[in-house]
């Protein structure tokens, strides 16, 4: 914010964010990818309570004690005491799907019981990957004397690896948090897992979830967390958030971004900057528009 003229930086400068100084240097040398097939994969409105892979007679993958479950539930939501549905993301996915379809894109949408971690891991380099769900980041691991496990792993391992302390939440996650047993994925995608996705030819990843842009800073590699994970997986650009944002405003932001990018045929950065300014006109407080971040590789 510039106190001399009452304007914010985004109103005066074309701001560019990279994950690290190394990425900034490498970006000058990289060749631009030519995208010939417009494909998009959309995830949203997961059914956090439902997933057919859960059963009562299989091994426990993620056994959480009551104290840790309470900590998770409080930390993973946008404002409640449990992982609640995100009705705004259903409208968000529908609107984006309509916009993409009207511009000739091939779309695969996964919602409710289909918005699973396992379906995400099957994707292969779509041009756009959009995930509208809860995100999380643990800056501090809660202490407990009951056992030395956190998220089913040795606590010391989690503390030492920040890639295990941030992630996204998919269908069935509540059942994992309650300590139920699973035959497959648990609905909790860590940054470490996200880094293994096949996004080698993906132009844009949008993480429409709270706190997805946070991570642990290091001297040489920028921020360890979901932003680093998706860049490592191959994504060229990432749009994510730094704090909890109103569901409806998030939906408006994302829908407006796609409209500008596809209809006006702008660059991703120009579409993002214009979207921020448009949202700022309707919601002047930085809380609403300042949370969103574009990271370029």
Model-derived regions, located:
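Catalytic cores of enzymes
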Residues: 1-297
